[in-house]
Amino acid sequence: MKSCHLKLAEAAFFIELFEATQERTESLTRGSDLETEASYLFSAIMNSFYSALDQWRDPATNKKGYEAFVKQNPEIYSHSHFGGWRSTTVHVGHIPITHAGYIPPKGGEVSLVFSAPPKLASTEIVEGRADLTFSPYYYVAYRGELKEVVSFARAHLHKLTVLIEFNEQSLP
């Protein structure tokens, strides 16, 4: 397995841990609160994305694809003075969770997420019953806009995985 694929798996791992902090409604460690732990995991997710993309990059074969992807995703990959999260958390300072709670989707949209619950947050499954669980969502700010972390991170992980796998298939 190529190193960039391990970094994609690492990002998925941190996203699941992040989601577990939301669903458990209690911190994972003794030394932190939920929002602090979520912000640590957010930084880890951003670093995993950056590492996967950087390890995939090859100036001889995919320079244009790399540059286009970075340009399309400035909230992660731009320099810190432009608000890039990864660069800010590594070179400037900590990125706190901006909001914990629920912000409805814009324009009457409905956001349904169907996925397996994080293993750390799993509860006993009762056959024939569906439980709706409401817990806070964590948001981070980018240029005045709040982005829900888990949805954003899952969508970005998918885009990054598609980029890497598509380009590997098209190589001779």
State each model region's role.
Residues W56-A60:
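Glycine-enriched, solvent-exposed interface loops adjoining structured elements
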Residues M1-Y40, T61-P172:
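Acidic, Ser/Thr/Gly/Pro-rich intrinsically disordered interaction regions
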